Amino acid sequence: MNAIAIIAASGIGKRMQLPGGRSKQLLEIGGFPVIHHTLKAFEDASQVTEVYIATKADNIDLLQDMARSAGFRKVRHVIEGGKERQDSVWNCIRMISDGHSGAGELPDAILVHDGARPFIRPEEIDDIVRLSVESGACVPGNRPKDTIKYIGSDPSCFGATLERSRLMQVQTPQGFRAGMLIDAHHRAAEEGWYATDDAALVERYFPDYPVRIYETGYHNIKITTPEDIPVAEAIYQALL
Amino acid sequence: MNAIAIIAASGIGKRMQLPGGRSKQLLEIGGFPVIHHTLKAFEDASQVTEVYIATKADNIDLLQDMARSAGFRKVRHVIEGGKERQDSVWNCIRMISDGHSGAGELPDAILVHDGARPFIRPEEIDDIVRLSVESGACVPGNRPKDTIKYIGSDPSCFGATLERSRLMQVQTPQGFRAGMLIDAHHRAAEEGWYATDDAALVERYFPDYPVRIYETGYHNIKITTPEDIPVAEAIYQALL
């Protein structure tokens, strides 16, 4: 099996304030930018052959240099993202689709991942590739630890309580058979329809293919602000 | 204003395996058991006058000794919990209710808290007391960071995606006007009805009193297994 991974990395450029007035362009864990760890996981996943990254125009050179100096040979394209995350993924999908239409060979699966989730393990990525080819679509998730309630009609108060045993928190990488994901994004772009995530998009256009659950632990967190870094460092140390 | 806090601490006795084959009876953070930090927060909250703890029979002496040696003078009773968490809270409520029926004076509010959430701040506890007296009920929560989906009719697949902007993850301490919480628990005990949390119980019997949202950060986590400890240590260090 072979899969292409799309990394949505438009949000990685938030400036990190450090003690002493210094700042860094990228949030770091264990001395490396978050996105470095993310790319390393895909580099080490045996089922992934190519990585496409969508990011802000300002970060393209930075990410290309990082991939080169780290020896991440799977990084094939670093391109500019779009207005919304879905637009960024769509930009990558068009490039994959165009690039492979000549040879007529699409990959078995396409995975879409948040650049800000550095702790996904290579073997988890490989499992998701396998299950998405098998079932059509596969998405990682875990059980919420807290009770979940709706916000009420008065937004300062709670509404109904959801039945927690029926809920999952979902993450990325979300994996799909390549043709299904390309087709779903194509149709969504035509309609101008935006979904919460790629799974919701595929569910809309391929309702007969339920999305397989891949239950992970609690390490696959999303790191977006400096406040997330102490917890991220702890998870990083625990995973080493 | 004055409030009594009920701490549900039946789950604190899980044995923590340490490197080298040693084990400790209680999970620890920063050299103190999780429950020590929890009790300290309530000790330091100016609106809380008394603390009732419900725990396993085996842990009663241990917690009484801990409270005494730490100088936690608000800990009034450490009693045996019941079969379910709700039974444990009900045991404390009956004791509060009986103890105050003679003098005819209930506290303004009763707070119910998970012993395994050590990072609630004293000033947050005081805010929740104030808001629960003002509105009838107040519960802390924060926004889910991940998309939430239902588990499907086939439990290996996802069902519908929930609208994340309408959801809150809820925690404790959950605060209520004393009479409302006592009455709701009394009626639930008569009916034999069990709720997800105390808020759901009060919502059932006092539907005209919507539960106020108190939005917290992401520090108020629940610590239940040794795997939670590295993240907990990181939050502890960041809060110091």
Curated annotation (Swiss-Prot), chains A, B:
The UniProt record lists the keyword Transmembrane: no
Keyword entries, A-Z: Isoprene biosynthesis, Nucleotidyltransferase, Transferase
Function: Catalyzes the formation of 4-diphosphocytidyl-2-C-methyl-D-erythritol from CTP and 2-C-methyl-D-erythritol 4-phosphate (MEP).
Gene this protein is translated from: ispD
Catalytic activity reported: 2-C-methyl-D-erythritol 4-phosphate + CTP + H(+) = 4-CDP-2-C-methyl-D-erythritol + diphosphate
Pfam families: IspD
Top EC class, one word: transferase
Site feature (Positions MEP for the nucleophilic attack) residues: R164, K222
Molecular-function GO terms, alphabetical: 2-C-methyl-D-erythritol 4-phosphate cytidylyltransferase activity
Site, as annotated: Transition state stabilizer: R15, K24
Family according to the record: Belongs to the IspD/TarI cytidylyltransferase family. IspD subfamily.
InterPro entries to which the protein is assigned, alphabetical: IspD, IspD/TarI, IspD/TarI_cytidylyltransf_bact, ISPD_synthase_CS, Nucleotide-diphossugar_trans
Keyword Nucleotidyltransferase tagged: yes
Top-level taxonomic group: Bacteria
Protein name: 2-C-methyl-D-erythritol 4-phosphate cytidylyltransferase
Pathway connected to this protein: Isoprenoid biosynthesis; isopentenyl diphosphate biosynthesis via DXP pathway; isopentenyl diphosphate from 1-deoxy-D-xylulose 5-phosphate: step 2/6
The enzyme's E.C. designation: 2.7.7.60
GO BP terms: isopentenyl diphosphate biosynthetic process, methylerythritol 4-phosphate pathway
